[in-house]
């Protein structure tokens, strides 16, 4: 997922004639726009480490079988906690005048994704521990609303209880 890559690395573009002149890009979308606009004139970037580790949980509108479940309405979503990076299309915004959560109807006709919940850390274990905290603190309620939040919470804690550095195998 590109958001995880963006949290782990930035790109530094330096003037080949003067290394004191540079700019840093943290968004892959921004880098693609720069490449489209400037093509071969753009110098090769240097990869700059940002955080040692990052993990993402894709919060989706799904039923218990993890199948898409469109059309629900979000009536409450807890605020992000410290260390949580939340990417959503404005769903978690409060009314600027009343500071009340604004109900949000999930279209879901083409994508069941509600938001990305991300954490960063110095190690894989600290990053997953932070994600466990985020998932434990996250509460979302509404009408005909089903999500994979509990699935993610169970999966992250299973990883923490077993080998967090497990490698895939076909054996």
Which stretches of residues belong to each language-model region?
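ATP-dependent carboxylate activation and anion-phosphoryl transfer catalytic cores
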Residues: 1-171
